[in-house]
Curated annotation (Swiss-Prot):
Coiled coil: none annotated. Disulfide bonds join 20-25, 41-85, 44-58, 52-75, 59-65, 92-104, 98-116, 105-110. It is found in: Secreted. It comes from Bos taurus (Bovine). One of its GO terms (biological process) is response to estrogen. This is Oxytocin-neurophysin 1. One of its GO terms (cellular component) is secretory granule.
Length: 125
């Protein structure tokens, strides 16, 4: 009885740990992703003038941001690519990057951020 309880506990702990399963393990193991060069995310939006910032977020300087629209559908393809990507130039907010004038986006969503407004950077207070 004690042996089966111990086996159940070990299986439970194994299930709760962060494992690298065969279908989602990057080449070289879990830590290999940290060594890869980060590529620019896929183009999206009208004329491919935007970049993906999340699975349903497409932003561009000339376009603004499309969230959950047909223009952002291509961004779902990022989920199937093996290497990480990054869009935007300047970091902002909590783990986000400047996506368009005055807008900061992370994979979870977008919000207004004065740090991303190029005109605010040059204005005098």
């Amino acid at each position: 009885m004690a042996g089966s309880s111990l086996a159940c506990c070990l299986l439970g702990l194994l299930a709760l740990t962060s494992a690298c399963y065969i279908q989602n393990c990057p080449l070289g193991g879990k830590r290999a992703v940290l060594d890869l060069d980060v590529r620019t995310c896929l183009p999206c939006g009208p004329g491919g003038k935007g970049r993906c910032f999340g699975p349903s977020i497409c932003c561009g300087d000339e376009l603004g941001c499309f969230v959950g629209t047909a223009e952002a559908l291509r961004c779902q393809e990022e989920n199937y690519l093996p290497s990480p990507c990054q869009s935007g130039q300047k970091p902002c907010g909590s783990g986000g990057r400047c996506a368009a004038a005055g807008i900061c986006c992370s994979p979870d969503g977008c919000h207004e951020d004065p740090a991303c407004d190029p005109e605010a950077a040059f204005s005098q207070h």
